[in-house]
């Protein structure tokens, strides 16, 4: 039986130091009290106009279902950010639309991973897509810290991340401008974990 999203988050964080707690909220109101900066990066607001220190947060898109993950970390934690994403298999059916999306968004390495793995192609594609999105989201906290003390813009997209293995320890690779940006942010690796939730692919990404 697949892990629940909560179990997957706990399992992904169990190998890291300085994690004080975590949780996932489900439903339309998930993340309703979360703040967003001018770049739409989420954060936990304090009682004033600032940010509550020691919290990392990530929210899935509203469609098909909204989940909000919150992690509390100590100052010496090796976890720099988290990202979560849900991807529906319906978007990756092997029709003209699904093939076009796959050709546009996936690298040759990712296509090879899909073609050689066991499982349905729509689910495997959904996993790869959710990994790229979650990896991108996992950089949000580090980016907020960067822009708090730097004027230099760091521009990259979810498609710039590449799933290099189904193994969590290898996780998501960072190509070209993304590799440069992550190096500046102090991110040396991004770990990826998967489960299935309500016929969708759910991914947790941990930036370290």
Residue ranges and their predicted role:
Residues 1-208:
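Core catalytic alpha/beta fold that binds nucleotide/phospho-ligands
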């Amino acid at each position: 039986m697949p892990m629940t999203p909560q179990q997957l988050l706990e399992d992904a964080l169990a190998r890291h130091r300085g994690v004080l707690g975590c949780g996932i909220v489900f439903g339309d109101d998930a993340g309703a009290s979360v703040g967003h900066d001018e770049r739409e990066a989420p954060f936990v607001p304090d009682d004033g106009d600032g940010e509550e220190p020691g919290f990392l947060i990530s929210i899935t898109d509203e469609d098909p279902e909204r989940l909000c993950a919150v992690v509390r970390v100590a100052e010496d934690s090796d976890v720099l950010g988290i990202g979560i994403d849900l991807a529906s298999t319906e978007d990756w059916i092997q029709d003209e639309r699904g093939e076009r999306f796959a050709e546009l968004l996936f690298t040759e390495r990712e296509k090879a991973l899909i073609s050689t793995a066991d499982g349905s192609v729509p689910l495997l594609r959904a996993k790869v897509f959710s990994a790229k999105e979650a990896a991108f989201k996992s950089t949000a906290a580090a980016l907020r810290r960067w822009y708090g003390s730097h004027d230099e813009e760091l521009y990259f997209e979810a498609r710039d991340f590449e799933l290099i293995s189904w193994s969590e320890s290898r996780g998501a690779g960072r190509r070209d401008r993304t590799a440069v940006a992550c190096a500046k942010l102090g991110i040396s690796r991004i770990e990826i974990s998967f489960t299935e939730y309500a016929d969708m692919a759910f991914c947790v990404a941990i930036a370290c």
